[in-house]
């Protein structure tokens, strides 16, 4: 018996041990649902308070929790997705607005004034009396006058107030002066060398004057001192000059002319050496690495420039990556609303279908914001069809969808459809007003206030819709006027060209009919009838010509012969002209 009781106790403990796991899972599920509901409620409050950004964050958290718990296409996620998409649409409207981001984060004037009043260290001019202000003005004027009278004092004060960097500049100036003094000494030595070329040569024949030794000793003494590289080069030049002097003086014994030439060369070289020694100190001092701090600063500046260029490039690449990764608010809103639309349409209940219609409406608004008016019209029509199935004729939602359809058609410049939908929205509102008036008569107490409030809201909507109708009518008139003007200009231009062509062709036809026997119906390009035949050659006998003339001159009565009309010729006129010319010649000879 004891064994059986022990076995039963173990089974009970096992059952009790397994039970808490299921209860914990239920508790976890309840916690997620409650947290999502809490987030949804807080988001709705923020939307009412027009704090859209915080509402977006809360709806995002709620939708992520529900999607992890139930899946992205679950029925439980539809409400959160709809709220999230709607809030994203509102946020996109704020960002696309003129003052969406301009005034965000800007301090208000009242806060700044309060801060100024709170600071006791900052004196305010408002608290001063007139006497104190006059005293301050006099002090300012006196200070300005003192500045004008004593500019030297200000210069001395500025000199005293200079930082340690000015002392370094003074040291550099002193170094420059010392370098100039050293160069002057070198030039004096060179003058001594040039003066020594007139001294006679030594007996040893080396050609070195006695004074040149003194110059060499001076140079050796200077070598013992710390000198720059350019001073050493000057010493080498001096040695070369001394050697050339000795060579020139050795040749002086052989030819006096050569000595003169050598002396001229020495003079020119000495003058060049003077110029070279007088200029380099400034360059030498400028190129000296005496200031390692400046060199380090330059290197640091170059390194900083390179680092800045690298950071700018990195920032540019990061911005591009973030732009590619980040999705716009409108795009994200469209995705969330489309997902919730599919979830609601899958359900067969009336509430779910009406929510699907609302999702269609919000999708149409997103398309209007993105200027995709054709897709917006399709979404609004789908919403309208669903609402007509499940709503009454006087429902405000129908008026809202008609209004949005009118806007979509108006933006797409389809004014007839826009006018029709605006008028339908007005008709729905009027029906709703009739229903509300009936409810006012029957209602009592708090219901009366609610009905009056709704009626006032509807009355406020009517003028806006009427203005939209007038705008669309004016736009339609302007469009028709412009179309007519364009047609008139196009048709008028073509008819003008045709009229001009017709008039010219008719006038040319008349002229042709008067000058020639060819009918008017000939083609314009055929000009063979305008070509006259050549006269007969003189080789023919004059008798034939006379016979031909006589036959042509014989008159023919109208209707005689074969019924052919006689064609007039120009030969008679030519004969008359010839006769007149002959008479004129006879008179002139007489």
UniProtKB/Swiss-Prot annotation:
- Its Gene Ontology biological processes? CENP-A containing chromatin assembly; DNA replication-dependent chromatin assembly
Which portions of the chain have biased composition (kind: Polar residues)?
496-525
Which sections of the protein are TPR repeats? 36-69, 357-390, 399-432
The ranges of region (Disordered) come to: 1-30, 102-328, 492-590
Keywords associated with the record:
Nucleus, Repeat, TPR repeat
Name the SUPFAM superfamilies for this protein: TPR-like
User: What Gene Ontology terms describe what this protein does at the molecular function level?
Assistant: histone binding; importin-alpha family protein binding
The answer on whether this UniProt entry bears the keyword Nucleus reads yes
Which residue ranges have biased composition labelled Acidic residues? 106-120, 293-327
InterPro entries, alphabetized? NASP-like, Tetratricopeptide_SHNi-TPR_dom, TPR-like_helical_dom_sf, TPR_rpt
Provide the protein's localization.
Nucleus
* Taxonomy, superkingdom: Eukaryota
Protein name in the entry: Histone-binding protein N1/N2
Organism, scientific name: Xenopus laevis (African clawed frog)
